Amino acid sequence: MYVLNRKGEEEDISFDQILKRIQRLSYGLHELVDPARVTQGVINGMYSGIKTCELDELAAQTCAYMATTHPDFSILAARITTDNLHKNTSDDVAEVAEALYTYKDVRGRPASLISKEVYDFILLHKDRLNKEIDYTRDFNYDYFGFKTLERSYLLRINNKIIERPQHLLMRVSIGIHIDDIDKALETYHLMSQKYFTHATPTLFNSGTPRPQMSSCFLLSMKADSIEGIFETLKQCALISKTAGGIGVAVQDIRGQNSYIRGTNGISNGLVPMLRVFNDTARYVDQGGGKRKGSFAVYIEPWHSDIFEFLDLRKNHGKEELRARDLFYAVWVPDLFMKRVKENKNWTLMCPNECPGLSETWGEEFEKLYTKYEEENMGKKTVLAQDLWFAILQSQIETGVPYMLYKDSCNAKSNQKNLGTIKCSNLCCEIIEYTSPDEVAVCNLASIALCKFVDLEKKEFNFKKLYEITKIITRNLDKIIERNYYPVKEAKTSNTRHRPIGIGVQGLADTFMLLRYPYESDAAKELNKRIFETMYYAALEMSVELASIHGPYESYQGSPASQGILQFDMWNAKVDNKYWDWDELKAKIRKHGLRNSLLLAPMPTASTSQILGNNESFEPYTSNIYYRRVLSGEFFVVNPHLLKDLFDRGLWDEDMKQQLIAHNGSIQYISEIPDDLKELYKTVWEIKQKNIIDMAADRGIFIDQSQSLNIYIQKPTFAKLSSMHFYGWEKGLKTGAYYLRTQAATDAIKFTVDTHVAKNAVKLKNADGVQITREVSRETISTESTVTQNVCPLRRNNDEQCLMCSG
């Protein structure tokens, strides 16, 4: 049997050659990772004439399939893939920069992949950069993290990867700190050690000729006219082209059958317009096929087209009334929630005939809205609960609309001196002011919280978190200056208000490393302390930057300029037990702030996969799940659980089959002790009330908002109403990002041993699980109030709410 080497030459291959290579890469791994076993798997999959690079990929896949035996197999898989990349790429920073800078397109025209100033910087400092860059850190990614980088992030020439992960991180760091090599290297080392990561657009574009590094763009319509609509559409296309996610407020566009003075005609309403936006999102992807364009459309529930809006993403119905590639959100005023709760009427209005509703909030909105009602200016009057149930029905069917509370978002914003905030972004964590002349922008980064756990002492390092939050704050502020803006209105907004968004990933991993169950008092206290530390550190760095460069342009008149911080807007008392807030407020009074907004925990979907952490502040959704890469699907087991089961001698093929049979839950597996069952509860087994409580606890330190998903296995109107009203009453800004549900019946699990599965089902049924009658729309009388329609158990005991019981 022979292989084709990198020169295309035939070469004999032996078991020993493959074994030696795998042994070389198995350093520091668990003894269960047996190179001989891996080698045998590779030999079994080989064929004569296989290329050496394909042989490496086969070896990596073999290890990835074995990762359910022990997580170190995933590390070995990544090492094999990384070693293969290293063989095909240069270890000289300047050489890589030369290739990227001198690249020419198919017609021979210069098409540099990095900017001239970055190229010149690398040549000037090449000796120091080559000394500082640490390629061994490439071997610290797991297989799926490395594959994510390989698929979308590492720069290519003619479809051949040129960058190593360390080159990527160095490029990003230099792109941010082009004028300061020490700060560039500080950022590089912290990112390469996985303490934090900048957001995907920053990783894509930093250091390139057009460094569009911002993640989030928020727009309001230019005008309620053909010119205004298509100018806004063009803005969306230009932003999407450069990898920005978009939130756009459409409540100022007139509704269906509204009079058009210019043509003496009537409007077709929102639906035909949104179908055009839908096709634009499909056509303009984010940077040449890296990921799809994504637009979230925001509307207020008084708009006359609200019912048609709620149907746009549904799978059934007429195609001309659907726009399924957009995401939808409702910007909910408190008045609507009160009317729903009290089972009162709700009037739908056209913004063309009832102007000013989108420009007001709180009492001012209520006065204007009721004035229009009294003057019979509305288009239609419905029961508030009928609209409420239409919202819930759409959420159950499609997972959207997102729910954000307009009054809470405006009342608790440090930008409320600018005007009324009309929408959020694609992921519901950015709350910023927009206008026809300003497109709001936010640059993001996330902190890997699990890196701050001292495993020996079982302690969390708040001092290190404080230090790194300050560095990230400085980085994100620097990006505002370094950024390429796809539209001028974005530059206007970002340079005036200078908001940034710092988030987290791996909070659930942090709890597991510290042995804190997600619902425990210790976890709840740590949750609060983490975000207090981050908010304090970000504010302190913003003050330091303001003392050097001056406060942001629109600072005067903001709550912060009056000594009011985020927790003050929640009427929460925060003492000086951990951080001296009085001293910080004194510094703010003296110097001001460089940034209007600072914290915005985002979903971290891609970057958490790169770093090997659980998403954001979310609990684990399952303890076993699929990861898809181009070469196939792989089972992945929660690595913390796998280690615990392995250390206790409980992990074997039978346990794996039981875990699959129970959809990744361990609650009904009798062999597993109770302490592990508490620690490894999935999100479906955690009380939703506790998740909302923890969101509110950290919310007093989050001056933007947070991407809060809601998880209900079998949603009903009663459960959803209970959950939404609880979040609203707790003062959340984002009440719900996505509604996540579980399928009523599981897909057939071909990999599950049927004998094990039958025993698992018997055990589960024997465990006293109660069957609760489902509540449907038909079982709820429109005569009753939502207060009566909540889960029956919650009426007398909040702790026993069906929505909360997991």
Swiss-Prot record:
Regulation: Under complex allosteric control mediated by deoxynucleoside triphosphates and ATP binding to separate specificity and activation sites on the large subunit. The type of nucleotide bound at the specificity site determines substrate preference. It seems probable that ATP makes the enzyme reduce CDP and UDP, dGTP favors ADP reduction and dTTP favors GDP reduction. Stimulated by ATP and inhibited by dATP binding to the activity site.
InterPro entries: ATP-cone_dom, NrdE_NrdA_C, RNR_lg_C, RNR_lsu_N, RNR_R1-su_N, Rrm1
Positions of the record's site feature: Important for hydrogen atom transfer: C216, C442
Catalytic activity as recorded in UniProt: a 2'-deoxyribonucleoside 5'-diphosphate + [thioredoxin]-disulfide + H2O = a ribonucleoside 5'-diphosphate + [thioredoxin]-dithiol
Xref: SUPFAM superfamilies: PFL-like glycyl radical enzymes, R1 subunit of ribonucleotide reductase, N-terminal domain
GO BP terms, alphabetized: deoxyribonucleotide biosynthetic process
Residue numbers binding GDP: S215, N425, E429, T604, A605, S606, T607
Residues annotated for ATP binding in this entry: N5, R6, E11, D12, I13, S14, F15, D16, Q17, T52, D56
Residue ranges constituting the ATP-cone domain according to the UniProt record: 1-91
Organism domain of life: Eukaryota
GO terms, molecular function: ATP binding; ribonucleoside-diphosphate reductase activity, thioredoxin disulfide as acceptor
Enzyme Commission number(s) from the entry: 1.17.4.1
A GO CC annotation given for this chain: ribonucleoside-diphosphate reductase complex
Keywords for this protein: Allosteric enzyme, ATP-binding, Deoxyribonucleotide synthesis, Disulfide bond, Nucleotide-binding, Oxidoreductase
Site note Important for electron transfer, residues: Y737, Y738
Binding residues annotated for dTTP, in chain numbering: D224, S225, I226, K241, R254, R261, G262
Positions of the record's site feature: Interacts with thioredoxin/glutaredoxin: C801, C804
Chain segments annotated as coiled-coil in the UniProt record: none
Catalytic residues in the record: N425 (proton acceptor), C427 (cysteine radical intermediate), E429 (proton acceptor)
Disulphide connectivity of cysteines: C216-C442
Self-association and partners: Heterodimer of a large and a small subunit.
Stated role: Provides the precursors necessary for DNA synthesis. Catalyzes the biosynthesis of deoxyribonucleotides from the corresponding ribonucleotides.
Family in the record: Belongs to the ribonucleoside diphosphate reductase large chain family.
Name by which UniProt lists this protein: Ribonucleoside-diphosphate reductase large subunit
Species for this entry: Plasmodium falciparum (isolate Dd2)
